[in-house]
A protein has these predicted regions:
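Bacterial N-terminal signal peptides
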Residues: 12-23
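N-terminal periplasmic/intermembrane-space "pro-region" immediately following the signal or transit peptide
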Residues: 25-51, 421, 426
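Outer-membrane beta-barrel proteins
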Residues: 45-49, 99-102, 130-136, 177, ...
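Transmembrane beta-barrel outer-membrane domains
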Residues: 67-71, 101-106, 157-159, 199-206, ...
Length: 426
């Protein structure tokens, strides 16, 4: 839901919607288009004590090996052209997520105004323009891969922004280019595997800037996102843990209290800012397809996932079949948090508490590489069958993209992930 600060924006949005609806009967064009998409995908990974996640906003389950949940979804979209300048768009997606309420299943909901051939203004809920697949992340049929590379798209779990989107499009000779600016509010609910707590991370002051171009077979982009003034609403167990750390920091127990004070400072991210930089390059000539993105995530606190990563995908179409290969990685920009003293010397309970807190901070630590082979078979103009094999090398403690508890996430391992998926549009 939008915060109190955005209620004036929400009221103005509803007022504008009412004006548009009241005037639609006299519009020169009044067309409604319905469309949809979906995927039925089964994924299986070969490790018994960790669980695969398509992205970290999905409910974690370390006991799960094979499941239809992570890579299956169903979406519908309504586009209402009120006239040649004004239109309405709404999109709803059912998929595996922590909370299945109407607000969360609403991926898009905006009014669009096209004053001329260059400007494009949208107000409402739009896709966060932080990566190449900003408007099609959920539409697997639109992409060669089974799923977007986990190292990038699994770590950035903010899919949409509630606010204003302004885009300017033009061309220079044969180069088409556009620049866009977004400003508004974002929020996401995630679940803690250890405590089953639901926590909400939100920001009312998120800025996204993107530059994009295409030239014949080539396309490229640059984007910057500043998620400012983060607010985190913790679940009851996480709140109790934070209170315990604060009390220990003030208990005057020497090294243990000093370490607790540092842990509290690094785990309290309210008011912090997270910044994302991204560059992308693509090529498609009808036969060969290449796509690549590089990104960097920066934050001041150790509880924030941060580092650099990217991927390179290459595929070649052979009639109805397109085999492809992908290499992707995430390199952390911070060190693993380790115990600086032994709280167990004070009491066994404090020793267990120390391990729990440190594993909680390290649960956001990402360090992995993935090598993928796959094939897409277009059996129909609106249906594709895909198979993909992922070989994932996870380094020590680097399980931030997986469902894993403190015991299963200490040592690195190699994981094999197999996926068969049917994607469709209508």
């Amino acid at each position: 839901m939008l915060s109190v600060a955005f209620w004036p924006f929400r009221l103005s949005f509803l007022t504008l919607l009412g004006l548009l609806l009241s005037s639609s009967c006299t519009a020169s064009a009044n067309e409604v288009a319905f469309s949809g998409f979906g995927s039925v995908g089964y994924s299986y990974e070969n490790e018994p004590d960790i669980g695969y996640l398509r992205n970290i906003s999905q409910p974690p389950d370390v006991e799960r090996n094979g499941s239809f949940l992570p890579d299956s979804n169903f979406g519908v979209q309504v586009d209402w052209a009120l006239n040649y300048q004004w239109s309405l768009t709404a999109q709803w997606v059912l998929e595996d997520r922590v909370e299945q309420d109407f607000n969360n299943v609403t991926e898009l909901s905006f009014i669009r105004y096209l004053p001329d051939a260059n400007w494009d203004l949208r107000i409402g809920r739009v896709g966060l323009n932080a990566y190449t697949a900003a408007d099609s992340r959920r539409i697997d049929y639109a992409h060669l891969w089974v799923r977007p590379p986990q190292e990038l798209y699994g770590s950035i779990f903010y899919d949409s922004i509630d606010g204003l989107d302004v885009t300017y499009r033009s061309s220079i000779n044969e180069v088409n280019w556009s620049a866009s600016l977004q400003y508004g509010a974002i929020s996401q609910v995630i679940e803690d595997e250890r405590t089953k707590d639901h926590s909400e991370a939100s920001s009312d002051h998120t800025l996204a800037i993107a530059l994009m171009f295409d030239y014949h077979e080539w396309s490229g982009r640059f984007s910057f996102v500043d998620v400012a003034d983060l607010t985190v609403s913790l679940g009851p167990n996480s709140q109790q843990a934070q209170l315990g750390i604060a009390q220990l920091a003030q208990a005057g127990l020497g090294a243990a209290s000093l370490e607790a004070a540092e842990i509290y400072a690094q785990s309290n991210i309210n008011g912090e800012s997270v910044k994302y930089w991204q560059v992308g390059l693509g090529y498609f000539d009808g036969e060969w397809q290449m796509q690549s993105e590089l990104f960097y995530v920066a934050g001041m606190k150790q509880a924030i996932p941060q580092g650099s990563g990217g991927y390179l995908m290459l595929g070649r179409s052979i009639h109805r079949f397109t085999p492809y290969a992908t290499v992707s990685f995430f390199e952390p920009a911070r060190d693993i948090v380790k115990a600086q003293s032994d709280w167990g010397l004070i009491s066994p309970q404090l020793g267990q508490f120390q391990q729990l807190i440190i594993s909680g901070i390290n649960s956001t630590y990402i360090d992995q590489d993935t090598y993928s082979l796959g094939i897409r078979w277009d059996i129909h103009s609106q249906v594709a069958i895909k198979g993909q094999f992922d070989y994932i090398q996870i380094n020590d403690v680097g399980y931030g993209l997986w469902a894993a508890d403190g015991r299963s996430s200490t040592q690195g391992r190699d994981v094999q992930l197999y996926t068969l998926s049917v994607n469709f549009i209508f």
